[in-house]
Amino acid sequence: MIVRRALALAALALAASPALAAPERPTIVVGSPDFRPLPIAVAAFQGEGDAGAAATQTAEVVRADLVLSGLFDVLDPRGFLADPAEGFAAPSIRFARWADVGADGLAKARVRRGPGGLEGELHLYEVRAGREVLVKLLRVDGADARSLAHRMADEIVRYYTREPGIFATRIAAIRRGRGTWELVTQDMDGGNQQVLLSERSILMSPAWRPDGREILVTSYRSGRPELWAYRFSDRAFRPLGRQRNAFGGVYSPDGSRIAFTVSEGNVTDLWVMSADGSGARKLTSDPAIDVSPTWSPDGRRIAFVSDRSGTPQIYVMGADGSGARRLTFQGNYNQTPQWSPRGDLIAFTARDERKVFDVFVVAPDSGAISRITQDQGRTNEEPSWAPNGRLMIFRTDRNGGIQLVVSDARGDRQTPVTSGKTDLAAPAWGPLAP
């Protein structure tokens, strides 16, 4: 995979700042023999007034985010040689000292309290060229230093990759309590967890609407599985459609349709309906069990699980239900497919002969399979892709307890994003923040 840092206007300047020159960006080739993370220094952020603690936390989270991305070699601040009190204007920065510690990039920031929230003034420099290349003023509501940090990290990633960052995104999941099921969301790195909904009936399979305004879930509030939607604007929780025994709903990439599963007697088929719950119709009519639909990013195909071959396998068909073909031929228990937003891979869970569950990816056209996890606990399952298609999150029982882990698309870097034991299930990575 290639992440380009090519010629482009780099400066998104403050109104009061002078225009910045458009720098030449070197190219990062991710996954190739030539790839190396960009060495970057994140200096101690300057807190104005009573924002000192917020500035410290913001810098720490920015560093952690950049490490998690896998694109950067984030240098240890204990080895910095530069004067912490040096200014922000390029002439006041001793770039040679930053170069001496191995930095190619340098991030600095001011953090202060503004009307209704925190403000951060992010400055980014190319050390070897000795110039400032980005100035960005960011604001968040309240005193949420983590959110400010995620937005800063997103800007740094955007500068170097010309792609949106994913650090301000949220993860939805289901948490089982004592007699309750909760729909929760959290930052992609595990922070800022919030309970959206607490039910005494089963909740399953959260799925985000592409615009992030709603989360679709399977609810047993009526005693049987049905599709319900949680709306953020007014916290409403309402049923969608009239199908009973409906579960596992997922929005199409444009948000106009929902694919889902209906179980009627001994028949379990895939259906589709409009996003408002109208116009439901069958997509499959096979005697086998068809479940777990996932859309291709162009909305033209659907991958799903079927046991029509005798064991659960991944299949792909047209979004109208036509042309179903088997995709996986290895293993005898493959489930929970998730199509990458980049379109090049489908992540899924497979169980081997030892009854161990692991995460794999398969190319939707060639059927080539790669393994993401191996000998890392007995359960690695329920993968969900980040909106950039470069990272995924899944559930694992490694290290003696259930955790959520973020991995790259090759499984080379796997980072726990929940501390200790957690009872979160069915993680669903949300869309890019507006």
From Swiss-Prot:
- Asked if the Swiss-Prot or TrEMBL record annotates the protein with the keyword Lipoprotein, the reply is no
Q: Which UniProt keywords apply?
A: Cell cycle, Cell division, Periplasm, Signal
User: What SUPFAM superfamilies does its record include?
Assistant: TolB, N-terminal domain, Tricorn protease N-terminal domain
Secretion signal span: 1-21
Q: What is its main location?
A: periplasm
One Gene Ontology term from the biological process aspect of the record: cell division
Positions of the UniProt region annotated as Disordered? 411-434
Spell out the subcellular localization from the entry: Periplasm
| Gene Ontology cellular-component terms listed | periplasmic space
The record ties this protein, via InterPro entries, to: 6-blade_b-propeller_TolB-like (IPR011042), PD40 (IPR011659), Tol-Pal_TolB (IPR014167), TolB_N (IPR007195)
User: Which Pfam families does this UniProt record tie to the protein?
Assistant: PD40, TolB_N
According to its UniProt record, which protein family does this protein belong to?
Belongs to the TolB family.
NCBIfam families cross-referenced by the UniProt entry: propeller_TolB
Q: Which PANTHER family match?
A: PROTEIN TOLB (PTHR36842:SF1), PROTEIN TOLB HOMOLOG (PTHR36842)
Known partners and oligomeric status: The Tol-Pal system is composed of five core proteins: the inner membrane proteins TolA, TolQ and TolR, the periplasmic protein TolB and the outer membrane protein Pal. They form a network linking the inner and outer membranes and the peptidoglycan layer.
Q: Describe the function of this protein.
A: Part of the Tol-Pal system, which plays a role in outer membrane invagination during cell division and is important for maintaining outer membrane integrity.
Name recorded for this polypeptide: Tol-Pal system protein TolB
